[in-house]
């Protein structure tokens, strides 16, 4: 499908539809848009020279109604052709979607955007994105502290740099503005000309069992200073009072039942359930554990550390890449597990060969 003026394939409230072995290019807006559908699959497609490549807006986090859509084994490149920022290879909204074994590359801004509940991004090869931007990540999420149980696992994210000189460089994963509860494990980050994993005032992120090679910085985990709290919560127009809007979105139903202990409490009279926003703007419950950094900064940098509660343990910092990988000079990061485990006893195996189109 080529030279489509508005959008490519739009599937509204569809179920069990498979879009497979297609080439889609030269769309003015979105190549594939799944709106409200369940258990659909986009697989083995070549999508290039488009604006948005794939948008999935399905399932419902508030009622814990899963979408179950799968984006698998696609080659996606040269997206964001018209709008150079905030148009992605894959955008996820809702609940229960999977993005796996895709090769995503060659674009000016981020590759994947997500929010919601129980989404999984795994075994993808992402490179050469965020080439003409700043303050961004190859995988980006932000301003949804009600997002829960999302996973970024087993991805190879590499060769990320921007042509723009800025004090706020690009990186691999950026969890911005109070985004919460992401498991980041088993990933390999290589040649990141900025911070590989950046978190701004998030909670319950578990960053464990990852490998960082030739990254300017492994992780930067912060809490905002007090003056920024009011600014981000109420004053910035594009933030749209996101802290309070998020509160309104989840103050009911199955979501409240599942996450009561984490996010709710009773008011002073002990009878009314309210969202527990106590110190919401500070980073808490963060874990940085059993990660291997090779040829990078000796330690992650934690800004505003007095406001940021993070557990740091079991990490290893080294300079001899050949000790830990089969052929790092040729970008073969197949791990030597015994060597890594001798340095990090709790480290579990990472399959570099799985981080690609299957």
Identify the role of each PLM range.
Residues 13:
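Extracellular repeat turn/loop positions enriched in glycine and acidic/polar residues, especially those
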Residues 179-180, 270:
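Active-site clefts of carbohydrate-active enzymes
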Residues 222-358:
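Acidic, glycine- and Ser/Thr-rich low-complexity intrinsically disordered tracts
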